[in-house]
Amino acid sequence: MDKFIGLDIHSATFTLAVVDGHGDLVGHTERKTSEKNLIEVVSSIEGRKGLSVEEGPLAQWVKLTLERYVEDFEICDPKENRWISDAGYNDDLTGAEKLVQLYRGGYTKAIEHPDRDGMALRRTFLHYRDLSKQ
C-alpha cells in the first residue's frame, strides 16, 4: 500500500489523515460530510490506498460510498483501539492520525459489514423471519 487513510466521520464534518508506508503524515483535511466531498478527497490521493474508519452510525454508508475508490477498506472496532479510546479527549485530527497509524501497523480489529447484495439478503431473511413469527 502506498498510502493509508484514517477517517474520523460525524454527521456534520469528517477529518481524514493520510500517512505513507513509513508512517509519515503526508496530508490531512477536514470537510463537511457529503458523498461528493468524501469521494473527491479520497480520489485525489494518489497511489494504492487503504482506508480505515471506526464502527459507528455512518460506517456502512462510508463503506458503500468509498470502498470502490480504495484497494483496502476496513471498518474497525473502536473498543479495540485503546490508544484512541483510553486517551481521554482527542480532537478529530488526533483521532484520525492515531487511527491511521494503528491501521498501517496492523493493530486494528476489523468488523465485517455486508456489501449491497449481503444487505439485501439480510433484509429478505429478516422479513421472512418476521412473517414466520406471526
Which residues fall in each region the model found?
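Phosphate- and other anionic-substrate recognition elements at nucleic-acid/protein interfaces
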Residues: 1-134
